[in-house]
Amino acid sequence: MINQVSVYRQPPVLSGCRQVKTI
């Protein structure tokens, strides 16, 4: 879960944000 939060915190990483939103 910490990994997901880390990706969500990064605005430049849209790919990661999309993955977290899907989950």
Curated annotation (Swiss-Prot):
Top-level taxon of the source organism: Bacteria
Induction entry: Expressed during stationary phase (at protein level).
Entry protein name: Protein YqfH
Organism: Escherichia coli (strain K12)
